[in-house]
Every structure is written in C-alpha cells, then in structure tokens.
C-alpha cells in the first residue's frame, strides 16, 4: 500500500495556540468533517490498511468462507460493541492520528506495522506506541 495523506484534509489547524507547563507552544487541530465520499473512503482505506493491507486480504481470508468485510470485522478489527473492543478501537484510532501527524505534518518516517501484526484483536499491541525517525 502506498500510504497517502489525502484523508487528512479534515484535520485542520484552528489557529489557536496553547502552551505546555514549560511554556512551549502547542498548535491545536480540529477534526472538521464535511460530507465528502472520496475523503471518507480515504479514511476507511487508510485505517483498514493498518490492520490488513488491501493487497493481502484475499490471501489471508482464504479458507475462512468470510467476505472481506466479515473477515475485517470478525478477525482483524477490535470489537465494535463488546468490551474492551470499543476502548481498543478508540486508542488505536488516536495512535494512528498521532502517527499521521508526525509523518505527514512534521516530516518524520513512522513505521506502520503495529496493527497488521496484532494477534488478539481486542487487546492493545504491546510495546512502544509510536516511533518516528527524522
């Protein structure tokens, strides 16, 4: 998968500056959703590929008798409603956003292997959350 930043058009600097305890400036971003199917598809593709590359899904689901959507929802993604799935989903989403910020806004290279190698879908992956190289 070629990682792109096209999905980030909804993430916009709002012009506010906050300051940390040690007086360092912090830019504030807002998630500004607009009804745009192409951007929504870009978000879906971007997050989906963290768990299972589009180029790999058919090989991985072979023999399961599951559709692509069923494979992702039953095997790869954290559960949508059964605990701790929702909190794991939220944490994963936040980590992906921070990784995207580091990579696409600050110019770091951020490896994207954390979720594709998950062995238990409803658990956080052990180890460092995010690492970026400049």
Question: What spans do the regions from the language model cover?
Answer:
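Mixed-charge (Asp/Glu-Lys/Arg
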Residues: 1-126, 131-134
